[in-house]
């Protein structure tokens, strides 16, 4: 981090010459995002003193000491806005974070047992978030690590590229559901915990706990398990509350500097919307591809206007169904809003935008298996409207083979100097059942270069070892 810097320049003028002293003291405070502003506060003192001189009766010398303080005042960092995506036409394998390849380590170097990983980025860094069970592998606390909700779960993070071990991880708050985002100046962290019938959303801005939001349907209030989205200092968070096998209506919270300033109630097809993966289609619109856990294998698709703070939900019309389990592609008949069959159950899906000057690309991920959380493929559709376009999405490569686990997936964008890099992350779960540890690796694919997606990802973990 870079600083407010104070420089004091003292110039002593004497009859015999010039003595220049420069005193510099610097302290680091925050990141410099634009040119330094200068402010001068002059201090002038002019004492008179008599100098020894051979002919003192005829000469009087005056020493004038002039002091000028120059104070460098740094501006606050700027709010972030979505930019055009960096150039590229395909995604490639960028990174694998497979903590349990280091499972022989003990103590502070032991990998944490985690699930629901996601990544969020600020102007200068990305953080890898997850929900831990407050246990490590190896260890003696494996019981309960397959549970979604309990009193031990916490939202943690490491710098992207670090392994989430005991010593590397920052524990942000108690939470069994989470999100986070950076507004350009500071991190906003979201955690949900509490009893199923009365869960609570907690907000942390930087190091301060700033606000809460209470359950409105008394049925597992929860959030998106991926990054929230910020523009001009306003951050938008998707939440939902309701039955996993019935009605669960979502809302959006508009948050500024850690405090809720508005609730947004979507209209349209609102029966069940959860675990949305959201991003900016433009400076005006946030779009989200979500999960319906009860009625359909199509993804509910949200459009949120950040100028009017209004949101509408409809089902995606494409014949490429993105949830798991799902029926055969193209088998659902009727209008776009038809639910079809095999709608029970679901999975969070990856979604990210490629913003270009003349068009927009929407990239999605789905499991290779129609019935199991195995494998992960990448798809893309340029331009058009997800609410009305019934065409199939174009397959763009295999990120995880059908022999490997492919659970939740999510989107995020890395900030380059002049553009944003779209990426998709995949949760690869080591499912040991209820008798042993249950944790995850994270595979990351990002837009870079041209050609075809070349290689899939494996975790390299054998739970029997």
Swiss-Prot record:
Q: Which cysteines are joined by disulfide bonds?
A: 86-419, 121-126, 181-228, 230-235, 276-290, 278-288, 317-336, 423-446
Which keywords annotate this record? Calcium, Disulfide bond, Glycoprotein, Glycosidase, Host cell membrane, Host membrane, Hydrolase, Membrane, Metal-binding, Signal-anchor, Transmembrane, Transmembrane helix, Virion
Q: Which InterPro entries match?
A: Glyco_hydro_34 (IPR001860), Sialidase_Influenza_A/B (IPR033654), Sialidase_sf (IPR036278)
What is the membrane topology listed in the Swiss-Prot or TrEMBL record?
Single-pass type II membrane protein
**Activity regulation comment:** Inhibited by the neuraminidase inhibitors zanamivir (Relenza) and oseltamivir (Tamiflu). These drugs interfere with the release of progeny virus from infected cells and are effective against all influenza strains. Resistance to neuraminidase inhibitors is quite rare.
| Superkingdom of this protein's organism | Viruses
Q: Where is this region: Head of neuraminidase?
A: 88-465
Q: Which residues does the record list as glycosylated?
A: 55, 63, 143, 283, 294
This protein's domain notes: Intact N-terminus is essential for virion morphogenesis. Possesses two apical sorting signals, one in the ectodomain, which is likely to be a glycan, and the other in the transmembrane domain. The transmembrane domain also plays a role in lipid raft association.
Q: What else is known?
A: The influenza B genome consist of 8 RNA segments. Genetic variation of hemagglutinin and/or neuraminidase genes results in the emergence of new influenza strains. The mechanism of variation can be the result of point mutations or the result of genetic reassortment between segments of two different strains.
> In its UniProt entry, what is this protein called?
Neuraminidase
What gene does this protein come from?
NA
